[in-house]
Amino acid sequence: MSVWALGLNHTTAPLDLRGRFAYALDQIEPTLRGLRESLARQPEATLLSTCNRTEIYCAGDHNDLEHTLEWLAHNGGVSPALLRSHAYTLQDDQAARHAFRVASGLDSMVLGEPQILGQLKDAVRAAEDAGAMGSTLHQLFQRSFAVAKEVRTSTEIGAHSISMAAASVRLAGQLFENLGDIRVLFVGAGEMIDLAATHFAAKTPKSMAIANRTLERGEKLASRFGAEVMRLADLPSRLHEFDAVISCTASTLPIIGLGAVERAVKLRKHRPMFMVDLAVPRDIEPEVKDLPDIYLYTVDDLAHVVQTGKDNRQAAVAQAEVIIDAGVQNFMHWLGQRRTVPLIQQLNAQTDEWRAAEIARAKKLIAKGEPMDAVLDALTRGLTQKMLHGALAELHAGDAASREATAHTVSRLFLRGQPPKEHKER
């Protein structure tokens, strides 16, 4: 059995390509089922999908990796060649190291950001619900969580990091002289919007509103900030009222189109509008960026802002890598032991078969009236002969070099490390 990972992220693939492989949390379970059903031998599998990465982790036959890449490409509506040119594949210790780095926030656009750990835990729960988790991936991810916890408690990897939400506020502050004078609209009601609303609320804007597909969830979030709630359907007619728009939904298609923004610009009489699209795939049509008086930023545009202070945390990164190295070694040791389980089961089955055969033979001898000492002698001799037959045959086979190697192995196994005695010519 092999552990491997297939993925693409913000460093290997552009935003629009990542958008083709973005899966909402409620899509992970059916997606994993579809993947596993497409394979002859269903591997253990987990799917992690965030705005910056989509990754599949599997434990099974490594030969399934190419099929998985083709399956994923088909799902995303692109050619395998295109996906292959932007994807990475990792096996065993490299896959484990990557999982540990992802969980610890070392592979994130925002170095040390804590949200990825929660997203990874959600992905594991979804895989469990899909019946796709097994003992190997369970070990991998439980160890990932433990390593991430140690990294965060033992290093300053998350110190002074700037989240996407905080970066949005910082950029808005560069456009507007006083954030207390602006009206802010948040589209969506998920974790990212929650964070963004928290950061903007700290600047006490003139007003805040939340537009969401379901009013109930929008109202729950709005109540914390004293914000207005509106329906997504009302967005086009009210867009012009807001100076800043922060959007992050799970929609597979843009929900703010070029036409709606053009109308808003005219109604605003060309006052600037600040827009941040934190969604993958996009919530705001990319052509909006070309409109006058519109300042649109995507998650990739925010990269240079969130990198601030990264150089100052390189010492923490080095400390984290040491912790991760130890975690990888421990996992690979466990995996190596795990790979011997089938052999151990085979050996136990074989010795049980020998034991049963010798017991049956002993019972026949007893029934014939043979002395008990003779029966026990025959029983033990039969067992030892069966156990040693393979080793003795190997010692007599092959050339001198192979016989010497076999002799040392047999000595280690049967003589508890005593060196084999050298043959003396008479």
Curated annotation (Swiss-Prot):
Domain of life: Bacteria
InterPro entries xrefs: 4pyrrol_synth_GluRdtase, 4pyrrol_synth_GluRdtase_dimer, 4pyrrol_synth_GluRdtase_N, GluRdtase_CS, GluRdtase_dimer_dom_sf, GluRdtase_N_sf, NAD(P)-bd_dom_sf, Shikm_DH/Glu-tRNA_Rdtase
Site (Important for activity): 98
Keyword annotations: NADP, Oxidoreductase, Porphyrin biosynthesis
Catalytic activity, as annotated: (S)-4-amino-5-oxopentanoate + tRNA(Glu) + NADP(+) = L-glutamyl-tRNA(Glu) + NADPH + H(+)
Matching PROSITE patterns: GLUTR
GO BP, sorted A to Z: protoporphyrinogen IX biosynthetic process from glutamate
Notes concerning its domains: Possesses an unusual extended V-shaped dimeric structure with each monomer consisting of three distinct domains arranged along a curved 'spinal' alpha-helix. The N-terminal catalytic domain specifically recognizes the glutamate moiety of the substrate. The second domain is the NADPH-binding domain, and the third C-terminal domain is responsible for dimerization.
Subunit-level organization: Homodimer.
Name the UniProt record assigns to this protein: Glutamyl-tRNA reductase
Gene behind this protein: hemA
